[in-house]
């Protein structure tokens, strides 16, 4: 290992620092899940002057705007996205010339660890420098219009006009057509195990400008900086830059075509692939044969422990689960219990009693989360979940207010002000019960009802769900629910 030669400061990052590889669920929670438009591009892969189009001024300017809009942390050179516009105005032409001469060398990415959904496990992400993000974005803008039309109809991740919900709905269509057994494929450390030679070979079938393949290969081999030390990357594709999602789709399109050739029903969102079969026996056979193909032909690794065959009602896909409706046996979409727990953990975080924040600040954060969460999960049957969660969240808010009143004298006064009799106000105002227990008592519930909490700026899961229903987000909204 070589020392990177520059002192680098680190902090614990989360997926929110990293705009290119957020999950569909996280994008929705942030209210930024907007399928991107593919820029107009009339070129083909056979274009031997593709590199000139990549570094064309207009294409680079568009790439700068997109990278600035996406934000994110700085790479190893500490240049921020705010500095990009000025940098490219001054150095853009020289940079383009360096790339055209084949002399440009991408900088190593900064490797960071973020928590995975499984407790105690971490995911490695690579953060390229902001300049390299722009170049990768410029490459993606030229390649996307060429490759996207060739991708499978069963592929939904990181594609214009497609989203996770489409993949989940397609799953239920297959399930309700009799394909009720699922092969839930898990590719082990997909981005870290991509065979670079295989990737270059697949690219060369379409891209006839060898300079472009060479530039992409340099990005794959740019290396990483880990704890201030440089490490080579002779395998894998950095899970970090704007080009990574496209490269993953190009590689896994090989899997899609093989599954189509075999006549399988399947859906894929990035490296999350589900194959649906009519029987458990057929699913087991499919799992074994497709595992051999993935490892023998694509040189990727299948996680045999996590790749399972199960009934469709037992699996989790993109945060959703499936259940069989009793009245007619139809397979329906639900929010998976793990996703429910994750949502509650986030609400707890946003409504902690020990935070000295105003309700305006709390409600702003909570409302943004609720909107994003419901917008993502709105295709699920979640009317009851929304109602129950609203009641639980309101109790959380009441505990905050009860704690804010602190002294018995203040509590008695505030309760009386809200229509509680003096006798009852004294009884509750001097009670030694804890905040959570007090928040459920009839007097507190009456004094701090829905109207009061709404007046503090908080929205509800139910009202947001009804909005999603009104715009066609789900087919099973039913009548409005009363929020407790």
Which role does the model predict for each range below?
Residues 405-476:
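Extended C-terminal regions of large enzymes
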Residues 124, 232-236, 348-362, 372-385, ...:
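Short, solvent-exposed helix-loop connector elements
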Residues 19, 23, 378-432:
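Conserved nucleotidyltransferase catalytic core and NTase-mimicking acidic/glycine-rich helix/loop elements
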Residues 55, 60, 108-110, 116-118, ...:
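Core structural elements
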Residues 1-89, 477-479, 483:
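Non-catalytic, polymerase-adjacent accessory regions of viral genome-replication enzymes
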Residues 73, 83-108:
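Amphipathic alpha-helical blocks
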Residues 98-113, 121, 150-316:
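Conserved polymerase palm-domain catalytic core
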Residues 221, 297-365, 369-371:
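A conserved non-catalytic segment of reverse transcriptases
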């Amino acid at each position: 290992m070589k020392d990177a030669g520059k002192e680098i400061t680190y902090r614990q990052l989360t997926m929110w620092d990293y705009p290119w590889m957020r999950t569909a669920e996280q994008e929705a929670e942030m209210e930024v899940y907007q399928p991107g438009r593919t820029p107009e591009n009339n070129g083909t892969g056979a274009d031997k002057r593709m590199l000139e189009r990549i570094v064309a001024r207009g294409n680079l300017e568009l790439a700068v705007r997109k990278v600035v809009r996406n934000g994110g942390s700085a790479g190893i050179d500490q240049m921020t996205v705010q500095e990009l516009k000025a940098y490219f105005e001054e150095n853009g032409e020289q940079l383009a010339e360096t790339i055209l001469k084949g002399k440009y060398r991408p900088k190593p990415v900064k490797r960071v660890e973020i928590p995975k959904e499984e407790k105690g496990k971490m995911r490695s992400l690579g953060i390229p420098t902001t300049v390299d993000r722009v170049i990768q974005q410029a490459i993606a803008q030229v390649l996307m219009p060429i490759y996207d039309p060739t991708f499978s109809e069963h592929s939904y991740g990181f594609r214009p006009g497609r989203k996770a919900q489409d993949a989940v709905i397609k799953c239920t269509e297959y399930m309700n057509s009799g394909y009720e057994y699922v092969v839930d494929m898990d590719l082990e450390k997909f981005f870290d195990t991509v065979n670079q030679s295989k990737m270059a070979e697949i690219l060369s079938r379409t891209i006839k400008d060898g300079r472009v393949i060479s530039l992409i290969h340099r990005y794959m081999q740019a290396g990483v900086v880990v704890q201030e030390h440089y490490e080579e990357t002779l395998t894998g594709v950095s899970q970090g830059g704007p080009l990574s999602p496209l490269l993953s789709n190009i590689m896994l399109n090989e899997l899609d075509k093989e599954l189509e050739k075999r006549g399988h029903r399947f859906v894929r969102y990035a490296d999350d692939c589900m194959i649906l079969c009519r029987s458990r026996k057929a699913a087991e056979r499919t799992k074994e044969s497709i595992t051999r193909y993935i490892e023998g032909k694509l040189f990727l690794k299948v996680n045999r422990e996590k790749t399972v065959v199960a009934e469709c009602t037992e699996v989790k896909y993109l945060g959703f689960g499936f259940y069989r409706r009793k009245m007619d046996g139809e397979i329906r979409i639900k929010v998976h219990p793990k996703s429910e727990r994750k949502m509650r953990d986030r609400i707890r975080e946003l409504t902690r009693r020990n935070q000295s924040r105003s309700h305006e600040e709390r409600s702003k954060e909570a409302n943004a989360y609720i909107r994003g969460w419901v917008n993502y999960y709105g295709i699920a049957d979640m009317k009851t979940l929304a109602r129950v969660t609203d009641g639980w969240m309101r109790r959380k808010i009441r505990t905050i207010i009860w704690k804010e009143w602190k002294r018995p004298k203040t509590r008695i006064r505030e309760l009386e002000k809200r229509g509680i009799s003096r006798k009852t106000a004294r009884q509750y105002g001097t009670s030694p019960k804890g905040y959570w227990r007090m928040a459920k008592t009839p007097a507190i519930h009456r004094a701090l009802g829905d109207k009061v909490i709404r007046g503090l700026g908080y929205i509800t899961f139910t009202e947001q769900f009804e909005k999603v229903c009104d715009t066609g987000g789900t087919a099973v909204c039913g009548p409005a629910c009363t929020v407790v």
